[in-house]
Every structure is written in structure tokens, then in C-alpha cells.
UniProtKB/Swiss-Prot annotation:
Its cofactor is Mg(2+). It is an enzyme of class 3 (hydrolase). Mg(2+) 2 binds at E70. Keywords: Cytoplasm, DNA damage, DNA recombination, DNA repair, DNA-binding, Endonuclease, Hydrolase, Magnesium, Metal-binding, Nuclease. The gene is ruvC. This is Crossover junction endodeoxyribonuclease RuvC. GO terms for molecular function: crossover junction DNA endonuclease activity; DNA binding; magnesium ion binding. InterPro entries: RNaseH-like_sf, RNaseH_sf, X-over_junc_endoDNase_RuvC. Gene3D superfamilies: Ribonuclease H-like superfamily/Ribonuclease H. One of its GO terms (cellular component) is cytoplasm. The keyword DNA damage applies. It catalyses: Endonucleolytic cleavage at a junction such as a reciprocal single-stranded crossover between two homologous DNA duplexes (Holliday junction). CDD domains: RuvC (cd16962).
Amino acid sequence: MRILGLDPGLARVGYGVLEVDEQRRNQPEMVDCGIISTDAGRGEGERMVEIARDLRQLLRLHRPDLAAVEKFFFYRSSNTIAVVQARGVLIMTLARFQIPTVEYPPMQIKLALAGSGHADKGEVQDAVMRELRLNERPKPDDAADALAVGLTAWFQR
């Protein structure tokens, strides 16, 4: 099974691709991780088009069986609406490719990986390293967060 984890954002969308041999019940292995970045000098609409285009390329390249997206919870921020809109672009693109999608709020991701819904970013990143048997934390943070979302999907299956 191939799982694509996504951490939504307007400037940067983190992604992480995991591979799991379900018959052997192996631990997930990281196939790829990184970010989709958009040009801050462009309008929001153009940036959404960039996100959709780059996600389509990732979907064609990695052919995930399942996508997991961080469910945004609201807080007061000047970019809240833009992030929610970018998340909508991700969900729409996944639907167009008919990829089953699950969503998890940050607290559930932290609980699944670090054992506490109030874990800090470092604790979650350490758990990602441990679960994927990595020697160092994935960079940038958005990619590490996306791997955490993907791992949560594997743990919650």
C-alpha cells in the first residue's frame, strides 16, 4: 500500500510518500518527501493552480492508494482562509484522481505518533524518525509533518 500524507499550506504544502507491504505487515518506509512551494509574488488564484498542478504530478509519479490530509482547525491568523482554500484544492485534486482520502486533526496526529495530543513538534518529528528508521529529521518541517499525517493513516487503518 502506498500512502500520501499532505500538510496543507498556501506558501508550502508538505508531502510524504510511504510504502507498506500489507501482507508482511512491515513498518512503513519513506519513498519520498518534500514540499510543493508557490511563488509569493503571484495572486492566490495562481498559487492554487500551482498547488493543483504540482499535486497532479506527484499523484502520477507515486500513484498512492490512500491520501491522508491534515484537517485544519481554526485559529486567528491572517492566512487562515488562504490555507483552508489550499486544503480545498488538495481535496478536490485527490477526488478527481479518485484517491480515497482520510483527514486527521493535529491533536490526533500528535496522539498517534507521540502518545500525547499535546506533544510538541520535536516529539512528533522524533517519532517520525523512529517509525521510519531515519537517521535525521526530514526537512523541511512541512515534509516531516506530512510524513506524520501519512503514518497516522497507517496506524489508524
